[in-house]
Every structure is written in C-alpha cells, then in structure tokens.
Swiss-Prot record:
Domain of life of the source: Eukaryota
Keywords: Oxidoreductase
GO biological process, one term: aldehyde metabolic process
Name of the molecule in the record: Putative aryl-alcohol dehydrogenase AAD16
Organism: Saccharomyces cerevisiae (strain ATCC 204508 / S288c) (Baker's yeast)
Encoding gene (name): AAD16
Length: 342
C-alpha cells in the first residue's frame, strides 16, 4: 500500500496531509441533520484515513457544540493512536455551550444571548477560556488554532496578543485564520509582526471552481508570504460532485447552501458544473476527484468532508489526477466575478 506523503504547511515546519479531513460532519444530528452520529461508522472512516496516510483532522469547537472535538479524542483513545502521529486543527469564534442544544443555524433568546456574551467572538477572555475548553475536549494540545471568523468588535492587538499567549502557554503550537478579507488578514499579521508575536501560518477560505474571489487578493498575498492555503468546501457543498440533474436532501436542510448562493446557481456556474462532468468523463475519473484535483493544482491543501471509506479512497485518488493547461482553462473559462460570500 502506498501511503500519502505529508507536506509542509506554509512557511512553518509543520507537516500535514495534502488533503485535510473535515470533521464538521462528525457529531450530533441535533446540531445538523446531515451529520453522522454513529461512532462506529465515524471511527471506521477516520481509521481508514489514518491507515492511508491522511492524518490531519480539521474541526472546530462550534461543530456539534463541542462533540466533534470529543470524537477526535475518543478516536485516538479507541485505537491507541500516538498523539504525535496526527495533526489536529480546530477553530474558535462561535458560541459553544454543551448545556444548550445549539444548532448549526442557531438563534438565541435574550437570556442565552446574555449568558453567551463572553463565550463568542475573539476577546481575550473568550480565546483563553475557549482554548482551554477545546484542549479538555480533545484531551490534548492543539496543533493549529484558527480564528473561525474575524471579530470586528475586538481590537486586533487584543486578538493577536491572546493568540500569542495561548501558544506560549503550551495549549497551541501554531495559529491560522479563516474566512476574511486579505486586508484584514494582512493587518492582523502585521500587528503580530510589529510586537514580535506568533503569526498566522495558514488561511482557510471558501474556494472552489464555483467561487474564486480570493484569487484577487487573499491567495496572491498568501503565496507571496508563503502562507498555507486550506480551502473549505472545495467541492462547493457537493455541487461539483454530481451532474446538475442530481440532488441530495442536504440542499434542503443545510442553510449554508443559501448563504453561499448554491441554491440558485447562475448560468455560468451551471456551465462550470457541466464542464467538470465532461472533463471527468473524458479522463475517466469522478467529478469529485476532478474538482479536488483542480484545487490541489492551485497549490492548496483542501479540507474535504468524508462520509464513507469509498469517499476517502476517491479523495486520495485525486492526488494522482493531472490536469493540462488546456483543461484548467476550459474549466475556469465560464467563471464570472461574484460579491464576497464569506
């Protein structure tokens, strides 16, 4: 068996899997009905990943209200896996309270708003407490802590100092960012540099054949400064993995489809999907393999949700898919600029 080779993340010494395992879909259906609850099934998928060489897990404290992090701990314990053989990434920003049944698309009453007022965002209070709670749920330190969104109410200096302090405290090894403008990322980075604090080694963003807005500023900035790129939803919530005439129940139940405007595709987006289908047939690979391969060809390490062992094998096979310049141009040609989604 050929194992997946690890790669360096950005300008750090940290080595990760070229494809990162997205753990948002492992947890509780109370959080989202498309989430997998069966731990036997989850552990089987995760162990298959591990045995093949995919050993980088991306989660967030918010996913299933903390349960996703606990599942990673339980997985490592169940198989007696050595901690140093895996990389654990998590995120902080959204509220987490395991005494509440917070939903993926949560709304809070006024009492919950009050209770959670300091359990969300990126204040020093929340970053330190949130990281300590994540470490408890994971049962170990965090390799890469990412700010899930930018908190526009907290001063950037406070954010970066708190992130620096959780690294120095030993809870976290590296820090990264997610889903923000290039100017915001740069200002945070320059703030850390000014004071000699730890800086981001990575950036997560929504990036795929249907949404390429970060090619304007964030991606060029990241590449210029050797920041690792970790696109989430590289298959556009599965839209790039099947022909236009096919659908799934998740489209109806996942509000992210609407916020990303995947519930009402533009004609050029439909054409891109048709072209992915055509090229995949010509190359005798699946549409998922092709769309993942495109992201890989862009120098990124995509975060992929994997709900079966077959999907794991499919994602790994994408590492062997090569695309010619003509094929890339053909896939990208219909794209038209869009407004910033996230």
């Amino acid at each position: 068996m050929v194992l997946v080779k690890q790669v360096r993340l950005g300008n750090s010494g940290l080595k990760i899997s070229p494809i990162v395992i997205g753990c948002m879909s492992y947890g509780s259906k109370k959080w989202a009905d498309w989430v997998i609850e069966d731990k036997t099934q989850i552990f089987k998928i995760m162990k298959h990943c591990y045995d093949k060489g995919l050993r980088t897990f991306d989660t967030a404290d918010f996913y299933s209200n903390g349960l996703s992090e606990r599942i990673i701990k339980e997985f490592l314990e169940y198989y007696s896996i050595k901690r140093e053989t895996v990389v654990i990434m998590t995120k902080i920003y959204f509220p987490v309270d395991e005494t509440l049944d917070l939903h993926h698309n949560f709304t809070l009453n006024e009492f919950e708003e009050l209770d959670l007022s300091n359990q969300r965002g990126l204040s020093r209070k929340h970053i330190i407490a949130g990281v300590e709670n994540s470490v408890k749920r994971l049962g170990t330190y965090i390799d890469l802590l990412q700010i899930h969104r930018l908190d526009h109410e907290t001063p950037m200096k406070e954010i970066m100092k708190a992130l620096n302090d959780v690294v120095e405290a030993g809870h976290v090894r590296y820090i990264g960012a997610s889903s923000m403008l290039a100017t915001e990322f740069a200002e945070l980075q320059f703030t850390a540099d000014k004071y000699g604090w730890f800086q981001f080694i990575s950036s997560q963003s929504y990036y795929n054949l249907l949404y390429r807005e970060d090619e304007r500023e964030l991606i060029p900035f990241a590449k210029r400064h050797n920041i690792g790129l970790l696109p989430w939803s590289p298959n556009a919530r599965g839209m790039l993995t099947r022909p236009l005439n096919q659908s799934t129940d998740r489209i109806k139940s996942d509000p992210t489809f609407k916020s990303l405007h995947l519930d009402n595709l533009e004609e050029e987006q439909k054409e891109i999907i048709n072209r992915v289908e055509k090229v995949s047939k010509d190359k005798k690979v699946s549409m998922a393999m092709l769309s993942i391969a495109w992201v890989l060809h862009k120098g990124c390490h995509p975060i992929v949700g994997l709900n079966t062992t077959a999907r794991v094998d499919e994602a790994i096979a994408a590492l062997q898919v090569t695309l010619t310049e003509e094929e890339i141009k053909y896939l990208e040609e219909p794209y038209k600029p869009q407004r910033q989604r996230c």
